[in-house]
UniProtKB/Swiss-Prot annotation:
Membrane topology, from the record: Multi-pass membrane protein
Gene that produces this protein: st7
Subcellular locations according to the entry: Membrane
One GO location term (cellular component): membrane
Keyword Membrane set for record: yes
Stated name of the protein: Suppressor of tumorigenicity 7 protein homolog
Similarity comment text for this entry: Belongs to the ST7 family.
Species the sequence originates in: Danio rerio
Keywords: Membrane, Transmembrane, Transmembrane helix
One Pfam assignment: ST7
Database matches in InterPro entries: ST7
Residue intervals passing through the bilayer: 19-39, 448-468, 475-495
Length: 513
């Protein structure tokens, strides 16, 4: 034993300062490489490589598999498939039902600020929508429709407008009027006039194709296209009335449209109706619309969830006081309002910061991602005034919305009332929103993994040691010897105690082994 100690002491005494410099430099280099790799992996995949390997591979080898996981593996396969299908549907990009007019609103913003409110990805999705709604395979039979079919594919706005005028020079064309109303009209009044002209042409085409739809697949496709055109025109006319202050007229137009075409849910006209009814403060009709569309079998939206929360909050918000509630507890009505807020926040956690004006708003995009930042912006842009109008509603939201996150500590893995929060929202929102002047809201906030912080600290510490050893080799050699002596002191103490307890003959036999 004493021979081993003397050998170790002799080895330490023969080490030169260059050895410590090389040792610390090598350690610093290795730590730096690990840090760079960890940071790259985290930025690309959102998780720590070392942590993932530890959980996925080392934990099963060490016997860390939960029994519940093993016992439910067969039953969870179907659940995983269902959740994956749900994830795909929730990551689908939807057309914003309240989208603004390009010429009368988006372009005016660009003229004033010099900023582009729409991204190329968003406008490209709109071009695809227009080709789906406003074209069909038989467009080549009519010269005006053939021109418009090319116009919807054109990327240059001025070229699209020129093509629309060329189509109108040949004959009246509903889709040409639509394009001019959307992109050339600089005011809502001008857009409304063009949409009214489009309505006359669109109704004529719709009645004609309705009579011929059963004569073949070609006529059926024409009728489907004409139906989409007519619904789009009427919906935009209703939105023009809403923007020009004729809200009751807009509500009537929307109700008539929903009765005439009840199966065309792709336009989500009920969300336009909800916003207009809130403007009229007709809360009874708002509740009736919610009763029809806030169903477990129907897809949810921020408009549905937060409007339901607003109605529940309206019943108690004017008298709500957090101090009084903490003393006496929440009443049944207050509990219902808080639960409705928690439900809405779980569906889209980005909305409260915009409603509470903790984050600045921008113009909403033409497409939104449900449960994402884009949907939160679109909802708040039109509904903030309705929350402000209800006395105490924002105060109740401010006091209760953060409590939602206690119920869902791991939102990406398990939800409370909804499916887990989809991980694809951040990527899609960065494509939909102008990140040049808007910081995309991310949920949940990504924190740096422990291993990245650890390797960063280790890299910094070893680099500092290498620098000090290079500058003060003799002093650092003394510190290194003192550190090693201190490190081995407990071991030496234990060995001395063992030697004093065990008989010398037994210890002699053990050392010989």
């Amino acid at each position: 034993m004493f021979g081993t100690e003397s050998s170790l002491s002799m080895f330490l005494n023969t080490l030169t300062p260059k050895f410590y410099v090389a040792l610390t430099g090598t350690s610093s280099l290795i730590s730096g490489l690990i840090l760079i790799f960890e940071w790259w992996y985290f930025r690309k995949y959102g998780t720590s490589f070392i942590e993932q390997v530890s959980v996925s591979h080392l934990r099963p080898l060490l016997g860390g598999v939960d029994n519940s996981t093993a016992s439910s593996s067969s039953s969870s396969s179907n659940g995983d498939a269902d959740s994956s299908r749900q994830s795909v549907s929730e990551c689908k990009v939807w057309r914003n039902p309240l989208n603004l007019f390009r010429g009368a609103e988006y372009n005016r913003y660009t003229w004033v600020t010099g900023r582009e409110p729409l991204t190329y990805y968003d406008m490209n999705l709109s071009a695809q929508d227009h080709q789906t709604f406003f074209t069909c395979d038989s467009d080549h039979l009519r010269p005006a429709d053939a021109i418009m079919q090319k116009a919807w594919r054109e990327r240059n706005p001025q070229a699209r407008i020129t093509a629309a005028h060329e189509a109108l020079d040949l004959e009246d064309c509903a889709t040409a009027y639509i394009l001019l109303a959307e992109e050339e009209a600089t005011t809502i009044v001008e857009a409304e006039k063009l949409f009214k002209q489009a309505l006359k042409v669109g109704e004529t085409c719709y009645r004609r194709s309705q009579q011929l739809q059963h004569h073949g697949s070609q006529y059926e496709a024409q009728h489907r296209r004409d139906t989409n055109v007519l619904v789009y025109i009427k919906r935009r006319l209703a939105m023009c009335s809403r923007k020009l202050g004729r809200t009751r007229e807009a509500v009537k137009m929307m109700r008539d449209l929903m009765k005439e075409f009840p199966l065309l849910s792709m336009f989500n006209i009920h969300e336009n109706l909800l916003e207009s009814l809130l403007e009229l403060q007709n809360y009874a009709d708002v509740q009736a619309v919610l009763a029809k569309y806030d169903d477990i079998s129907l897809p949810k939206s921020a408009t549905i969830c937060y409007t339901a929360a607003l109605l529940k909050a309206r019943a108690v918000s004017d008298k709500f006081s957090p101090e009084a509630a903490s003393r006496r507890g929440l009443s049944t009505a207050e509990m219902n309002a808080v639960e409705a807020i928690h439900r809405a926040v779980e569906f889209n956690p980005h909305v409260p910061k915009y409603l509470l004006e903790m984050k600045s708003l921008i113009l909403p995009p033409e497409h939104i991602l449900k449960r994402g930042d884009s949907e939160a912006i679109a909802y708040t842009f039109f509904h903030l005034q309705h929350w402000k109008r209800v006395e105490g509603a924002l105060n109740l939201l401010h006091c209760t919305w953060e409590g939602t996150f206690r119920m869902i500590p791991y939102p990406l893995e398990k939800g409370h009332l909804f499916y887990p929060y989809p991980v694809c929202t951040e990527t899609a929102d960065r494509e939909l929103l102008p990140t040049v002047f808007h910081e995309v809201s991310v949920y949940p906030k990504k924190e740096l993994p422990f291993f990245i912080l650890f390797t960063a600290g280790l890299c910094s510490f070893t680099a500092m040691l290498a620098l000090l050893t290079h500058q003060f080799p003799e002093l650092m050699g003394v510190f290194a010897k003192a550190f090693l002596s201190t490190l081995f002191a407990p071991l030496n103490f234990i060995m001395e105690k063992v030697e004093s307890i065990l008989p010398s003959s037994l210890w002699h036999q053990l050392t010989r082994i």
